[in-house]
Amino acid sequence: MAKSPATTPSPRHAFAKTLKTFTTASGKTGQYYALPVLAKTYPGIARLPVAMRIVLESVLRNCDGKKVTADHVAQVAQWQPKAARTEEIPFVVARVVLQDFTGVPLLVDLAAMRSTARKLGANPKKIEPLVPVDLVVDHSIMVDHFGTKKALDLNMKLEFQRNRERYEFMKWGMQAFDTFRVVPPGFGIVHQVNLEYLARGVYQKKGVYYPDTLVGTDSHTTMINGIGVVGWGVGGIEAEAAMLGQPVYMLTPDVVGFEMTGRLREGVTATDLVLTVTEILRQHKVVGKFVEFFGEGTRSLALPDRATIANMAPEYGATMGFFPVDEKTIDYFKGTGRTKAEIEAFEAYFKAQGLFGVPNAGEIDYSQVVKLDLGSVTPSLAGPKRPQDRIELGKVAGQFESLFSKPNAENGFNQAATKLLTRYPLHRTEVTATTVAPPPVPEGAARTVSEMESNKPRLETARTNAVTHTKAPAALAIGNGDVLIAAITSCTNTSNPSVLLAAGLLAKKAVEAGLKVQPHIKTSLAPGSRIVTEYLTETGLLPYLEKLGFALAGYGCTTCIGNAGDLTPELNEVITQNDLVCAAVLSGNRNFEARIHPNLKANFLASPPLVVAYAIAGTVLTDLMTEPLGKGKGGKDVYLGDIWPSSEEIRALLKYAMKGKAFAANYAKVKTEPGKLWEHIKGVTGTAYTWPASTYIAEPPFFDTFVIQAEANSKEGTGGNGQKGMQSVQGARIMALFGDSITTDHISPAGS
C-alpha cells in the first residue's frame, strides 16, 4: 500500500473528482477512482452487474479524452439490461497472460519491432509491453511415457528436446523485456498457475489502485473469473494491442444472471455441476454475453468449484462466467499464499468500491435470469462428441448404444447395430515395456522442416513403459466402447482439490478391494500445478493412483489438448482395420471427435474419480450405477458405490490442499529453482534478438520495407493519405467455409 498520498491526477482527467482514498485493516491507504462517487451522477450504477461495474472502473480510470472518452464512461454507467447492442466499449486491461503455443508468435512480433528499431537507429528498449505479460509454458508436454514413476522425467526430456529452439527464444524474451515473465515448463497449466499465483486481486500504479483485469491468448482464460477477475480469451492481435497499452474493444454485452439455490447432494461433484451448467447455458444461447452467478447457492460453492465453472465458459458459449468477490475469495487468497498486504488491499478496495459480496436475487438488473437448484444436479458425463451433451451416469451405456448406429448428422457413429458387441483379437506380445526412441537433436538453433517433422517418437516405438507391475493378457480382445485412454488432466478439474482427493480416495479403496486396470489402457495423471502432487503425496493417496496406472506424466495440458501421445501400433491397427468406436474418458473441458486421439471417436468428459472408475471398468458399456466395476478379491463383484468416497472423507483431507506456505514455496521456485532442463537452455542475450538461420523462429517480413519508406518519408514527405507505404488489402478471399460445430480445435497444431 502507498505510505504517502499519491500524485494528484492531471487536471485534464474529466473525472478527477472521483479520486478518493481507502484504508486497509492495517491502516495503510491507497487511492482509487470511486464508483460510489460516480453513482451520484449515474444512480443506476448500484444496480449494474458486478462485472459491468469492474469494466466501468477501467473506462473511468483510463478516460483520457482520446481512446477513452467521457461518452464511453456515460455509455457503460447507463448500461441497460435489454438495450440494443450497437456501441463498443474500450476496455483497458491490467495485464496479459499467454500460453506457449499462442504466446510465441506475439514474442516474435515484439522481437521484430525491436530489430526494426535497431535498424532505424532507434533504441530497441523503446519497444516494451506497457502492462505485465506472463507466459506459462504448458502446451508442449506430451504423454509419451505413462504408467511409471519415471514418466514425468522421460516426458520432460522429450519435451525439451523437441522445443529447445522455442525455449531459447523465450529465455531471450525474459532477459530482454522488463515487463515479460516466463513460467518455465513443469510448473503447471496457465489458468491454474494464474489462479494460484499470478492473480493479485488489485494492482496499483503511482499509488492509484485498480482491479486485476486481463485478456489471454487461450479460450479458458475465463477460469480467473472464479476469483472475481474480469478477463477472457482473445486472439493474438487483440492480445498484442493490449500488451502495448491499447484498449480491447468489445460490443456492449448482455449480462445473463445465473441464480443458484440449494446445495449439492452427497456424491455429486463440481464436475457434475459444471457439465449441468454447460448444458443449461448452451440451451439459453449465451454466445457473446457475460454470465454472472448470484444467489445463496452460489455463495455456498467453494472457490475451486467456482473456478471450475468459470473455466468452461467457452463450452457454454459465454464471454465470461463471472463470480463476484466475497469472503471465500479472500480465504482462497490466504490459502494460496498471497501476502497479507496483498489480501488486505484486495479486500479493502473491493469493499470501498461496493463490489464485495455475491448479490442476492433482485439486487441487480440482468438481461436475463437463469435458475438452477443445486440439489437437482446428478452424477454425469458429457459426450461422446460435444461438451454440452450431458448424460446422467446411469444412462451413459444406453446412450452410447443408441448413438452407435445413428447417422453422423444425429451425433451418432453410423455403425451397424449388429457390430456393437463384436470383439476383435489384439495381436501383441506379453511384454508391456518398450522405450520411446530419443528424437534427433540437431546442433545449433536452425532446424530443417524434415527435422521438425521427425522430431517425435516413431510409431513403432510409441508404446511406452506402461504398467510394468503386471503383464498384459496373452489373448486380449478389443471392442466398441472400450476405454483406451483414461486421463486425469486439465486445469478445469485438477485445480479443484475436492475432485482430486475423491479420485485418490476411490483409487485407494479400489486397490484395497483388489480391482485393477488393464495395462493396454493408457492411464495418466497430469495436473495443472505441482501443488496437486504435493497434497496427494502428503495424504498418502498418490501411491494408490500409481498402482492403477495413474502415475504422474507431466504438469501441463497433455491429453486435454490432444497431447495424449500415441496408442500402441497393435491398438491402432485393430481400431482402424475394424472401424471400431473406442473411447477416451478424461477430466478435461473439450471432447470434439478426434481431439484426444485421431483413432478414438468417442470422448467423454468426467470427474477425476469417474475417470478412475471407467479405467477399472474398461468400457463405457458398463452401467456404473447398477453393474459391477469388476471382480475384486476372491472373485467378488465390486460396485462403484462400494468405493465411492463420502463428502466427509473428502472434507477431512482438504486441509492438506490449502496451505499458504506450500503455495508460496512452490511458486518461489519459478525464479530460484526453475529446473535443470530449463537452466541448461542457452538463451540469446541482448536487447534485440539475433535471428538464427531457422525455418521456425524466423524474423517476419512485415517491416522489410519499413526503413526504405521511413527514409522516403523524410525526403519526400508522406503521400496524399498521409500514410506513405500503407497498402490496402485487395482481392482477399475466404480460405475455407465450414459448417456448424467446426472449431479452431480442428486445425490447431496442439497435439498434432
Segments predicted by a language model, with ranges:
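Short amphipathic
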Residues: 257-261, 367-375, 732, 736
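N-terminal amphipathic, basic-rich helices that act as targeting or association modules
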Residues: 2-3, 9-159, 188, 301-311, ...
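Cytosolic catalytic domains that perform sulfur/thiol-centered chemistry
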Residues: 20, 30, 382, 388, ...
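Terminal amphipathic helices with adjacent charged low-complexity linkers/tails
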Residues: 92, 110-165, 292-446, 626-691, ...
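Generic recognition of flexible, low-complexity loop/linker segments
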Residues: 19, 85, 124, 204, ...
